[in-house]
Structure formats: structure tokens, C-alpha cells
Amino acid sequence: MSKVAVLLRVLPDDAETKPEELYKKIAAALPEKYQVAQYQAEPIAFGLEALRMVILMPEETEGGTEELETIIQSVQGVSQVDVLNVTRFSG
């Protein structure tokens, strides 16, 4: 089964929320078919840090990244989810 790698930027709802906290909440909320391949903090401004994530998902997922975005958006502490890139992953 082929997979795609989805690069996301997740913005917290306030500057007090740390990227590591968001990562833990998001990872716990994701179903098994999604796999976090990489994550890192991205400084934005005035102490606000976004979370950049690469998530692997099945290529055949109905609706593309919509389900993934909805799941992450529903996590407490998440303000916004931006899909930055989607590419086929072989490995």
C-alpha cells in the first residue's frame, strides 16, 4: 500500500501552548492509519511557536487530507491547521 507524506503547520490557540504539548495531544488523537514521521517547533513571533509535522497516511484515503485536518483541528489547543505540502512517499 502506497503512502503520502503530508507536511502540516499547526498553530496553537495561544502563546502559552508549547509545540511538544500539541504534538502529544495530536499523536494521541490520530487513528492507526496515520503515522507521525517527524515534528519540530517553528518560531512565529512574540513567543508563539507553531508545530510542523510530517504525517504519513494511506494514499487511498477517501477525501485526501480532509479527515486528517478535521481530527487535528478538533484537538484542544489547536487554533489552525495548514497543509503545506503533500507528496507520495516510498520507503
UniProtKB/Swiss-Prot annotation:
Keywords linked to the UniProt accession: Elongation factor, Protein biosynthesis
Q: Name one GO molecular function term.
A: translation elongation factor activity
Q: Which InterPro entries match?
A: eEF-1beta-like_sf, EF1B_bsu/dsu_GNE, Transl_elong_EF1B/ribsomal_bS6, Transl_elong_EF1B_B_arc
**Has the keyword Phosphoprotein been applied to this entry?**
no
Which Pfam families does the record match to this protein?
Answer: EF1_GNE
PANTHER family in UniProt: ELONGATION FACTOR 1-BETA
The function of this protein is: Promotes the exchange of GDP for GTP in EF-1-alpha/GDP, thus allowing the regeneration of EF-1-alpha/GTP that could then be used to form the ternary complex EF-1-alpha/GTP/AAtRNA.
The similarity comment for this entry is: Belongs to the EF-1-beta/EF-1-delta family.
Q: Name the chain's protein.
A: Elongation factor 1-beta
